[in-house]
Amino acid sequence: MRVFLDTNVILEFFIEREDVRTAAQLFNRLKDEKAEMYMSVGSFYTMMFLIDKYLRKELGLTGEVRIATLRSLAVKIVKAISVVEHDNESLLRGVEDMQFKDIEDSCQYQAAVAAGCDFIITYNVKDYPHTLLPVFSPSDFLQYE
């Protein structure tokens, strides 16, 4: 099973936001089922920015401690989740797909397709209309057999 994880799902788990319990259950299930997990390279960049902001503003980390913590989390993420890169063609498909109201979501979808994923898991299911891949929220995926 190949699963594409949207940025918000990965962040939920790694910075322990509101629904961390569901995110942890999701990651445990995917690990138990030996699922191949994927994210876009854009997700990685976005997460590094947001996690760094969280470390500074919410946890008050600065200097060497902050960067060491950020690097440690980055390594954990990259070891757990494979990164899908875009080529110009897949990015153009994402930009030109009029079914999506958000270009970023459309590019995420194209990354999932490029990785040959079976599912997309996101907290924003409504942002993925009319896709060929099934799109689940973490809680809905946990109920899926």
Question: How should each PLM-predicted stretch be described?
Answer:
Residues 66-91, 97, 128-145:
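Short acidic, glycine/proline-enriched helix-loop-strand junctions
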Residues 50:
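ABC-type ATPase nucleotide-binding domain
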